[in-house]
A protein has these predicted regions:
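C-terminal alpha-helix plus adjacent terminal tail
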Residues: 1-12, 59, 162-168, 187, ...
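Conserved CoA-thioester-binding segment of acyl-CoA-metabolizing enzymes
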Residues: 1-55
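Glycine- (often His-adjacent) and acidic-residue-rich active-site loop
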Residues: 3, 56-92, 108, 218
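Terminal peptide-recognition signature
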Residues: 17, 21, 36, 54, ...
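Hydrophobic alpha-helical membrane-association signature
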Residues: 32-35, 82-85, 185, 226
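Catalytic-core regions built around general acid/base machinery
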Residues: 39, 85-97, 103
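A general structural signal for well-ordered alpha-helical segments in protein cores
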Residues: 68, 86, 143, 152-155, ...
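Crotonase-fold acyl-CoA enzyme core
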Residues: 94-201
Length: 253
């Protein structure tokens, strides 16, 4: 299928999805959200894809947030329907079973900032700037996702003030896992993706599910959940076979 608002490409076992509205700073229009959700559905069901990279087109923006002009022009009925669709798309992204790496190539404001908190790993460059704007225009978002990234005290600060976070600070507080020059961003994201894709996809996806499902559980329940998963859902090769395969990949005989 040909998309109007996103680009989709494959590099080995990696899907690279690009929000492609650079003239609008990759603002999240309803159409872009629908296309992104549709492609994510395809990628999730494609066993050849093990990792996803999400980025924005152009040198200025990952995503400037929601498409405000589209919202202003929408009827109440259109707004309600589109809000419901976006809600489901957001949850699909947040609960996506494969790892998603964000290549944060510029500003991520409002809904764009919220989007970054739903990704597993965020790699940014010097142009990255993240700002949670909801309190400034009478809304609330990221209360459920941002504390998992930066911790509750810092999440409160960023959500209450709505202040911008520059790239260096973003890395320091955990909003970015890694900070690289913009000229190296794509390669850095691909290198991380290749490292993940080289591992057993069932284990990687199982670990992600455990991490997400265990949120808020007591420590002992989290321990038991991992043990149960190892016995059942994550049951694969025997430990001996797994270690043997690992050594063979390392060239050890």
């Amino acid at each position: 299928m040909s998309y109007q608002n996103i680009l989709a490409e494959r590099v080995d076992k990696i899907a690279i999805l690009t929000m492609n509205r650079p003239e609008k700073l990759n603002a999240l229009s309803y159409e872009l959200a629908v296309e992104l959700d549709e492609e994510l559905g395809k990628v999730e069901n494609d066993d050849d894809v093990r990792v996803v990279i999400l980025t924005g087109a152009g040198p200025r923006a990952f995503s400037a947030g929601g498409d405000i002009m589209q919202m202003v022009k929408s009827t109440p009925e259109e707004m309600a329907a589109r809000t419901d669709a976006r809600r489901e798309a957001n949850w699909h992204l947040a609960s996506f079973r494969k790892p998603i790496i964000g290549a944060i190539n510029g500003i991520a404001y409002g809904a764009g900032a919220q989007l970054t908190t739903m990704l597993d790993i965020r790699i940014g460059c010097e142009h990255a700037e993240i700002q949670f704007l909801a309190a400034k225009y009478g809304r609330a978002n990221s209360t459920w996702s941002l504390p998992l990234v930066v911790g509750m005290p810092k999440a409160k600060e960023l959500l209450y003030t709505g202040r911008p976070v520059k790239a260096e600070e973003a890395e320091r507080i955990g909003l970015l896992n890694q900070l690289v020059p913009c000229s190296q961003l794509r390669e850095a994201a691909l290198e991380m993706a290749k490292q993940i894709a080289a591992n057993d996809p069932r284990m990687v996806q199982g670990i992600k599910q455990l991490l997400h499902d265990d949120i808020g559980l007591p420590w002992r329940e989290r321990f038991d959940a991992e043990q149960n998963a190892r016995k059942n859902k994550l049951k694969a090769n025997s430990p001996r076979e797994g270690f043997k395969a690992f050594l063979e990949r390392k060239g050890v005989r």
